[in-house]
Amino acid sequence: MALVTQARTLGKYFLLLDNMLVVLGFFVVFPLISIRFVEQLGWAGVIVGFALGLRQLVQQGLGIFGGAIADRFGAKPMIITGMLLRALGFALMALADKPWILWLSCILSALGGTLFDPPRTALVIKLTRPYERGRFYSLLLMQDSAGAVIGALIGSWLLLYDFHLVCWVGAGIFVLAAIFNAWLLPAYRISTTRTPIKEGLKRVILDKRFVQYVLTLTGYFVLSVQVMLMFPIVVNEIAGTPSAVKWMYAIEALLSLTLLYPIARWSEKHFRLEQRLMAGLFLMSISMFPVGITHSLHAIFLIITLFYLGTITAEPARETLSASLADPRARGSYMGFSRLGLAFGGAIGYTGGGWMYDIGKQLELPELPWFLLGSIGFITLYALHRQFNRKKIETAMLTP
C-alpha cells in the first residue's frame, strides 16, 4: 500500500512538471497570434479567428479518438507523438505568410493536442483519489495561470524582435516536453481494462447524461476562449501596444495564485459542483457586456478581473464534474469526449468572435460582439440550470 501511495505522489509531481512545460510552450505562441496577424500584418479578424477555431475544433473534436487509442495502447506513445506534432505545427507557423499556411500549422498543432491531451487528463484521474481530485485540479489551474503569464511575457518580448523566434521557442519547449516524457513517464495504462477502441467510443456515446452535459458546455467555452482572441485585441487597441497583453495574463496569474485554491476549498464545503460551475459562468457572462463601451485601460483590466474570477470559480468544478461522470473502464474515451464542448465552443467562439469583431468595426458598433457573447453566456446558464434541475445527477457523483 505504501508503494502505491509513493507511486501516486511521484506521479502527481511528474504531472505538475509536465503540465508546466505544456502550458508554457502553448502560451509563448498562441496569445500573440491575433496580435501578429490582425494588428501587425492587417489580416481580417475572421481569417485569424477561423485559424484559432480550426485548431480548437480539430484538437477537441477528435479528442475522443485520441482518448480511445490511448485506452487501447497506453498513454506514453500518444503523449510523445502528440508533443512532437505540436512542435512541428509551431515551426511551420513561423513561415506563415498566407492564410492556408497558418491554417495548416494550426491543424498540425491541433492533431498533436488530440493525441496528448486526453491521456494526460486521464492520468490525473488515475493518479488522484476522488476526495483530492478537485484540489489537484485547482493546483493545475494555478500552474496554468503562472505558465500563461510567463509564456505571454516571453512571447511578447520575443515578438519585439521577430515572430519567428516566438514560434521556434514554443516548438523547442514541446520537443523538450516530449523528451521529458520519453525519459520519465512510466508505461501507464489509463483505464481499468484494456478497452478496444470501438467499445470505448460506444460506451461514452451511449452515456446520454454525459453527452448532454458536455454539449451544453459549448456556450461556456465560447466565452472562455476569448482570452486568446478578443481580449488581447481590445487590450492592444486601448493600450496601443501589444506588450500590454502580458498584464492581462499577470492579472490571471495573480488571482489564480492567491484565490483559486482558497475559493475551491471553501466552495467545495458549501456548494455542489454544478452550483459552483453556474456561479462562475454568471460572472463570466455579466463581464462581457461593458467591454465594448470601455475606453480606459484600467477599466478593461477591472472587467477582465471579474471575468477571471468567474473562470477560477467555474473551472475546478467543471473539471471535477467531468471526471466524476467518467466510466473508469474507458477513461481516455470519456476525457476525449469531454473536450467536444470545447471543440464546438472554440470553433464558434474564435470564428464567430473574429467575424463579429469585423462586423462591429464596419458598423461602428464595437459593443456588438460583446453583447452577443454575454447573451450566449446567459443562454448557457439557463440550459445548465434546466439540465441540473430536470434530472438530478446522483449526489455521490456531484461531490468531489
From Swiss-Prot:
It is a multi-pass membrane protein. The keyword Ribonucleoprotein does not apply. InterPro entries: MFS, MFS_dom, MFS_trans_sf, MFS_Transporters, Multidrug-R_MdtH. It comes from the Bacteria. The chain crosses the membrane at residues 13-33, 34-54, 99-116, 139-159, 165-185, 214-234, 244-264, 289-309, 340-360, 365-385. GO terms for cellular component: plasma membrane. It is found in: Cell inner membrane. The keyword Ubl conjugation does not apply. One of its GO terms (molecular function) is transmembrane transporter activity. Pfam families: MFS_1 (PF07690). Its main location: membrane. Keywords: Cell inner membrane, Cell membrane, Membrane, Transmembrane, Transmembrane helix, Transport. Belongs to the major facilitator superfamily. DHA1 family. MdtH (TC 2.A.1.2.21) subfamily. PANTHER family: MULTIDRUG RESISTANCE PROTEIN MDTH (PTHR23517:SF2), RESISTANCE PROTEIN MDTM, PUTATIVE-RELATED-RELATED (PTHR23517). This is Multidrug resistance protein MdtH. The lineage of its organism: Bacteria, Pseudomonadati, Pseudomonadota, Gammaproteobacteria, Enterobacterales.
